[in-house]
C-alpha cells in the first residue's frame, strides 16, 4: 500500500514538473496581420508658368489663351498653362533666355526676335517670299514633312546651346507692308525715314535706304506720337487696329513680301517637357495644332472687319505696295541670304532644306491652284481709282 502511494505521488510530481516546464516555454510569435499599402495619392493639377512677347490686348495673346484653355480641357484639368502677357515676368524680348534658365516654364513668341544670337533664327519664323514662294501651309509642310521641326530643335539645343524645344503655333501672315506718315511711290521715298522694323527685315530695309529701329509692339504707337519714327511694320488688320496704328498714321500699304508665311512659336523648357507624362505631352501637341488652325480662320474674319473699320472710322487709306519696292525687297533679301550662307553653315543648311522642299511643292501648287485673284476679281472686282480732276468742268 505504502509502495503504491509512493509511486502515485512520484508520478503526480513528475506530471506537475512537466506541466510547469511546458508553461515556461515561449511559443513562436504569430505572424503580424497583413496590412495593405495605401494607394498612391493622385497627383494634383500642375501649372506651367509661361509668358508671351505680346501686349495683353492683342489677338496674338488670344492665340496663347486659347492654347491654355485647350490644354486644360484635354488633360481634364491636370495640366494648366498660366498664359501671361509681355512684361508680367520678364521683358518681351527676354522670354527665350528666361525659359532656358527656367525662370519661365515656357514662352509664346517668334524666332526672328533672336537673330542677334544667330541669323538662322529668321528661317523658323518667316523669310521674304516664304521663302522661295511658299505660303503658310507650305511652310508648315516643311516643318512637319520636310525635316523642319528637327532642325528647329537642333537650332536651339545644338547651335544656341539652350535647353528648350519649340512648336509652331501662331500663323500671323501674310503681313501688310506697313504704315507711313506720308505716301510712298518708289524707293526714293524711303530716304530720311526712320521705321520700326525687326529681325532680318530691318537689315533688308537698311539695304534699301531706310533707317530702322527695333522695339516691342507696345512701344510703336507712343514712339510714333512723339515723332521718333515715321513708319512701322507690325502685322496688319486686327492687330494693327488694336495696337492703335490707324490713330497715328493714315497711309497703310499692303501686301508685303517680308513675312508672307510668318509663324510664331511655343517654347518649352526641355526639362519641363521631359518631366511631363506622355499623355500631357500629347495633349500639348494636339492643342498646338488645334490652336494654329482655329485661331487662324477666326483671325482672317477679324482682319476683314478691321479693314472696314480702318477706312470708315479712321479714314485710313489702304494702298497697294508699288511692285518696284517688292521686287527690290526680294533682291535685297537674296543678297543677304547669300552672304549669310557663306559664313553661317547652319543658316545654309536650313535654307537649303527649305529650297529643296519648295522646289517640289511650289511649282506643283502653282499648277494645281488657281490664282486667288482670279475668282476674287470675278465676284468682287476692285474699285478703280477715282478719275483725276483734269476733265472737270470750269
Where are these regions (language model features)?
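N-terminal secretory/targeting leader peptides
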Residues: 23-139, 155-394
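Extended rod-forming repeat segments used as scaffolds/tethers
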Residues: 13-14, 384
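Bacterial Sec-type N-terminal signal peptides, specifically the leucine/valine-rich hydrophobic h-region
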Residues: 17-20
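Core domains of carbohydrate- and sulfate-ester-processing enzymes
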Residues: 146-151
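Bacterial N-terminal signal peptides that target proteins for export
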Residues: 1-12
